[in-house]
Amino acid sequence: MFNLTAASDEERAADISEMQSRLTALIGVVPGLQSITLKPDLGLVEDHWDVVLVSEHDDNAALEGYQEHPAHKEAGAFIRSVTNDRATVDYEL
């Protein structure tokens, strides 16, 4: 989950769109990455996180590879430039 730095709804929407574009581009590039989804909060309740990221990987080794992959690090650099807070949970289904 991320909180965005942008103040206006237009900037926030543009940042989310760019985040989505960069992250979905990782599918087929990062081995073991099955899917990646980025969704904005519905805005129904104040003080919620702005956006959530869910990624699915073949296994824990694929998750570790994803975290270290240069393409992921490049996408992460952009995400860090437009966010000011992050919460992460890794779990198995």
List each model region and its residues.
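Short S/T/G/P-rich N-terminal loop/turn motif that feeds into the first structured element of a domain
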Residues: 1-50, 58-65, 91-93
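C-terminal structural segments of small proteins and small subunits
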Residues: 57-82
